[in-house]
Amino acid sequence: MAEVLRPEMLDISNDTSSLASPKLLHVLAVDDSMVDRKFIERLLRVSSCKVTVVDSATRALQYLGLDGENNSSVGFEDLKINLIMTDYSMPGMTGYELLKKIKESSAFREIPVVIMSSENILPRIDRCLEEGAEDFLLKPVKLADVKRLRDSLMKAEERAFKNIMHKRELEANDIYSQLKRAKI
């Protein structure tokens, strides 16, 4: 008599190491002002975030490997960015232009991008939000802003994790049903 297979006996991978841990978010902070960079870095670290800081949009693209050259500082598989926070007004390339390049990238378009600026210019804010910015924060950024962003991202990561685990459970049950019908 054949042994009946149950879902827990199936070799369905439960390895979730490739999924982002909702405990420590990795933020890429982009600002040409050293004072603002240090300030946002401090706020993010106090909020339990891993932080990588760069001083320009060009350096951010290099870090992400989106500069068209193969000189990224890290390998793609090691690069898990949960959020990009960028100043709007920077020499060379604005935060808006960086946002557009990120949203054009198939590898990074899903990463939320937050634009920061000391200038409260409504058409600029609207343009950034229409282009796909997650939020637009006025400087100086407050700890409450960072905590709100972090909490929102952690909830989104948790929902994504639960959705993946639910999908895997449904797949296992489907395989189990198929095997049961086939009487294997």
UniProtKB/Swiss-Prot annotation:
SUPFAM superfamilies: CheY-like. Residues 26-154 form the Response regulatory domain. The modification 4-aspartylphosphate is found at D87. Its main location: nucleus. Predominantly expressed in roots and shoot apical meristems. GO terms for molecular function: phosphorelay response regulator activity. Induction: By low temperature, dehydration, cytokinins (BA and zeatin), nitrate and high salinity. Keywords: Cytokinin signaling pathway, Nucleus, Phosphoprotein, Transcription, Transcription regulation, Two-component regulatory system. GO terms for biological process: circadian rhythm; cytokinin-activated signaling pathway; regulation of DNA-templated transcription; response to cytokinin; response to red light. InterPro entries: ARR-like, CheY-like_superfamily, Sig_transdc_resp-reg_receiver. PROSITE patterns: RESPONSE_REGULATORY. CDD domains: REC_typeA_ARR. The keyword Transferase does not apply. GO terms for cellular component: cytoplasm; nucleus. Two-component system major event consists of a His-to-Asp phosphorelay between a sensor histidine kinase (HK) and a response regulator (RR). In plants, the His-to-Asp phosphorelay involves an additional intermediate named Histidine-containing phosphotransfer protein (HPt). This multistep phosphorelay consists of a His-Asp-His-Asp sequential transfer of a phosphate group between first a His and an Asp of the HK protein, followed by the transfer to a conserved His of the HPt protein and finally the transfer to an Asp in the receiver domain of the RR protein. It is found in: Nucleus. Belongs to the ARR family. Type-A subfamily. Functions as a response regulator involved in His-to-Asp phosphorelay signal transduction system. Phosphorylation of the Asp residue in the receiver domain activates the ability of the protein to promote the transcription of target genes. Type-A response regulators seem to act as negative regulators of the cytokinin signaling. This is Two-component response regulator ARR5. It comes from Arabidopsis thaliana (Mouse-ear cress).
